[in-house]
Amino acid sequence: MSGKAKARRAAMFFRGCSEDASGSTSGSTLLSEDENPDTNGVTRSWKIILSTMFTLTFLLVGLLSHQWLKETEVPQKSRQLYAIIAEYGSRLYKYQARLRMPKEQLELLKKESQTLENNFHKILLLIEQIDVLKALLRDMKDGTDNNHSWNTHGDPVEDPDHTEVLDEEMSNLVNYVLKKLREDQVQMADYALKSAGASIIEAGTSESYKNNKAKLYWHGISFLNHEMPPDIILQPDVYPGNCWAFPGSQGHTLIKLATKIIPTAVTMEHISEKVSPSGNISSAPKEFSVYGITKKCEGEEIFLGQFIYNKTGTTVQTFELQHAVSEYLLCVKLNIFSNWGHPKYTCLYRFRVHGTPGKHI
């Protein structure tokens, strides 16, 4: 082979190698350029995923924080709200309690004040009558010659000793009138008087009338009750509303007396129509009977009498027992059969028992 042929072959060899090298280089370059879009896409996907997870985590933390704040703040606000509602509720019920004061009580106060005023005028009138009586007696004294002495000039001279006697007589008369005014009308001992030791036996007594208007309420719960107990009938304080009421027109009560007595009479008392807030006394008892109980209030019932309380009569009415007994009794039972027309209840103000006490208590 000649030298030119070798040189030509070598040049071709090196040319092919350079082309292969350049081709591989360009291929690798193209490959890397083809691979770059895939790498960039993966990176963007991860960024999106991470940002989404971060956002979700942030939102979740915020939601949990908001829920926790609600759970801590709302109960406190609720308690404050309930406290405010309770306070205003109590004020409202207090106001309602004041407004719930029945008009009857206001009328009752007016009636009582009017009664006191009338009594005051009666006392003033009585004092005036006493003064007139004094003047008349003195005029009678001055009109008698025996009550005067004459001086030398013919002028009458009043006898001081006689004047003192007359003043003493007038003073005794005034004291007698005042004593009669203070004395009880019945003028008999009351052995059913609570202050003397008498009492009501609840087991033998009817239930009291339940009057919702006589109660005060707070949040729907009654906490004050103005109903009168049965033993109010054993006390001398008789004024409108101060009575024991039982439902309907029939009821009974068992009274343990202050001491053993042989009963002879009973007294029933009610208020007058003039001082009644309603203008009538239809709740007053009408027909009633009285029994004596032997053996410590648990024995046989002994009939003592049946009577009628007259509402048009005096307020204090005494009844002599129709059946006399010879043994001493400690308990008396009062049975009421009817009233004077009230449809809901009967009201008993005072009941007294009179008689002869035993020698030993």
UniProtKB/Swiss-Prot annotation:
It is a single-pass membrane protein. Residues 22-31 have a biased composition (Low complexity). Pfam families: Sad1_UNC (PF07738). Residues 70-361 are perinuclear space. InterPro entries: SUN1-5, SUN_dom. GO terms for cellular component: meiotic nuclear membrane microtubule tethering complex; nuclear inner membrane. Residues 1-47 are nuclear. It is found in: Membrane; Nucleus envelope; Nucleus inner membrane. Residues 103-129 form a coiled coil. It comes from the Eukaryota. Residues 197-358 form the SUN domain. GO terms for molecular function: protein-membrane adaptor activity. As a probable component of the LINC (LInker of Nucleoskeleton and Cytoskeleton) complex, involved in the connection between the nuclear lamina and the cytoskeleton. The nucleocytoplasmic interactions established by the LINC complex play an important role in the transmission of mechanical forces across the nuclear envelope and in nuclear movement and positioning. May be involved in nuclear remodeling during sperm head formation in spermatogenesis. A probable SUN3:SYNE1 LINC complex may tether spermatid nuclei to posterior cytoskeletal structures such as the manchette. The short coiled coil domain is proposed to be not involved in load-bearing and force transmission from the cytoskeleton but in mere nucleus anchorage instead. Self-associates. Interacts with SYNE1 and SPAG4/SUN4. Proposed to form a spermatogenesis-specific LINC complex with SYNE1 during sperm head formation possibly implicating a SUN domain-based heterotrimer with SPAG4/SUN4 associating with SYNE1. This is SUN domain-containing protein 3. It comes from Macaca fascicularis. The gene is SUN3.
